[in-house]
């Protein structure tokens, strides 16, 4: 059975805090509690799903591994009993579920064993792919190595030694589920012995320990289309975990993450950049050379340009991956105050300042307006 995303299972964002994850789990546990939803199989499944998600996301190390590699990063075989998996001789003791009043309710549903009769699709995997802005905008092809679980070639995924066959589970009599009565509680849950398969492996394969799978890695080629951005996903069909008992494999989702750039910031289809200009260039106008992802362009600065003014270079942005017009490059200028002046430069600026004294309202209207407001403020408050 394909596993859902753990963050989606709890209804939280991927950057959710520990407290947000804990609150979300409590809310889901109360809503889908089996005692509140007797006989509701869907509620029971959601309850177990939320519990499993919380077990991973509440652990910093497991969460980091899951964020990087998805379900494979937290070891899909974890939680399977001993050498034989959930249906092997190392399976959990049936009595363990009676540890306390809520032990049966909060006990997880074991994963399906390799020797069961039911057929399930493999779990989906996720891989975080970090790209430069240039590669994201232009498109590229990269090779990635991902951890995966492959079908054991020694037993062909059956989990048993050659000549051996799974046996009917003695705990659930082949049903895959057990009902537990404890006081006022009556809970039906996945059989802890066979993990819901209805069968147990008494003579497990030595190579895979009865799981039917072995840990491995594979190299895949990923074609990244031009225009992708952080948060986009690329689906590689059939590259997830193999299915159980002959089921189809899951998919691999490549999650795009674009690194910060030295010059540009992505804003949808547009690119933004900061351009420092000198005080003389701002006052007199001129041209300044700015970079684009296609090369250099000359940006025309009109006389009297103010700091913070944004100039548009059309067609130098991003062509959206889902179609639409190409974006623009938005250049925000900042007038830079000169520093480390020579004596001569200071004298020239002082002379320039004196020529502005009588005509400031004409050349610097914002400053003159601000000074007028400040004077009025002082007069009103007699400061």
Swiss-Prot record:
What sequence ranges are listed for the domain J? 5-70
Q: Where are the zinc fingers (CR-type)?
A: 139-217
Q: Where are the CXXCXGXG motif repeats?
A: 152-159, 169-176, 191-198, 205-212
Q: Where in the cell is it found?
A: Cytoplasm
Where Zn(2+) 2 binds, per the record, is at 169, 172, 191, 194
Alphabetically ordered keywords of this record: Chaperone, Cytoplasm, DNA replication, Metal-binding, Repeat, Stress response, Zinc, Zinc-finger
Keyword DNA damage found: no
| One of the record's GO molecular function terms | heat shock protein binding
Extract the InterPro entries matched here.
Answer: DnaJ (IPR012724), DnaJ_C (IPR002939), DnaJ_domain (IPR001623), DnaJ_domain_CS (IPR018253), HSP40/DnaJ_pept-bd (IPR008971), HSP_DnaJ_Cys-rich_dom (IPR001305), HSP_DnaJ_Cys-rich_dom_sf (IPR036410), J_dom_sf (IPR036869)
- Asked if the keyword Cytoplasm belongs to this entry, the reply reads yes
GO BP = chaperone cofactor-dependent protein refolding; DNA replication; protein refolding; response to heat
Source superkingdom: Bacteria
**What's the stated role of this polypeptide?**
Participates actively in the response to hyperosmotic and heat shock by preventing the aggregation of stress-denatured proteins and by disaggregating proteins, also in an autonomous, DnaK-independent fashion. Unfolded proteins bind initially to DnaJ; upon interaction with the DnaJ-bound protein, DnaK hydrolyzes its bound ATP, resulting in the formation of a stable complex. GrpE releases ADP from DnaK; ATP binding to DnaK triggers the release of the substrate protein, thus completing the reaction cycle.
Please state what the annotation says regarding this protein's domains: The J domain is necessary and sufficient to stimulate DnaK ATPase activity. Zinc center 1 plays an important role in the autonomous, DnaK-independent chaperone activity of DnaJ. Zinc center 2 is essential for interaction with DnaK and for DnaJ activity.
Give the multimer and partner information. Answer: Homodimer.
Its name, as the record gives it, is Chaperone protein DnaJ
Q: Which organism is it from?
A: Alkalilimnicola ehrlichii (strain ATCC BAA-1101 / DSM 17681 / MLHE-1)
Source organism phylogeny: Bacteria, Pseudomonadati, Pseudomonadota, Gammaproteobacteria, Chromatiales
């Amino acid at each position: 059975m394909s596993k859902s995303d753990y963050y989606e299972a709890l209804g939280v964002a991927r950057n959710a805090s520990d407290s947000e994850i804990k609150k979300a789990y409590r809310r889901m546990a109360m809503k889908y509690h089996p005692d509140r939803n007797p006989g509701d199989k869907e509620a029971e499944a959601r309850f177990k799903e939320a519990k499993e998600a919380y077990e991973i996301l509440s652990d910093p190390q497991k969460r980091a591994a899951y964020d990087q590699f998805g379900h494979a990063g937290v070891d899909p075989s974890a939680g399977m009993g001993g050498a034989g998996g959930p249906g092997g001789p190392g399976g959990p003791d049936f009595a363990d579920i009676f540890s306390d009043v809520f032990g049966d309710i909060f006990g997880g549903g074991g994963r399906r064993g390799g020797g069961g009769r039911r057929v399930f699709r493999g779990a989906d995997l996720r891989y975080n792919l970090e790209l430069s802005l240039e590669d994201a905008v232009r498109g590229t092809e990269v090779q990635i190595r991902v951890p995966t679980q492959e079908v054991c070639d020694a037993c062909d995924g059956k989990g048993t030694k050659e000549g051996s066959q799974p046996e009917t589970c003695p705990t659930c009599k082949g049903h895959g589920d057990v009902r537990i009565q404890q006081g006022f509680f009556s809970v039906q849950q996945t059989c802890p012995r066979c993990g819901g398969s209805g069968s147990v492996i008494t003579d497990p394969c030595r190579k895979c320990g009865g799981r039917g799978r072995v840990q491995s890695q594979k190299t895949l080629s990923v074609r990244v289309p031009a225009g992708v951005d952080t948060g986009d996903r690329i689906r590689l069909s059939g590259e997830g975990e193999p299915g159980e008992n002959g089921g189809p494999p899951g998919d691999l989702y490549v999650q795009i993450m674009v690194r910060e750039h030295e010059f540009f910031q992505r804003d949808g289809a547009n690119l933004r950049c900061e351009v420092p200009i000198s005080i003389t260039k701002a006052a007199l106008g001129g041209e300044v050379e700015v970079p684009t992802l296609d090369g250099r362009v000359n940006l025309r600065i009109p006389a009297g340009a103010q700091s913070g003014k944004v100039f548009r270079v059309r067609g130098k942005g991003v062509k959206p991956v889902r179609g639409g017009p190409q974006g623009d490059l938005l250049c925000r200028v900042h007038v830079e105050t000169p520093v480390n002046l020579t004596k001569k430069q200071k004298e020239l600026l002082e002379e320039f300042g004196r020529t502005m004294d009588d005509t400031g309202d004409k050349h610097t209207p914002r400053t003159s307006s601000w000074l007028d407001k400040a004077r009025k403020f002082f007069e009103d408050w007699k400061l």
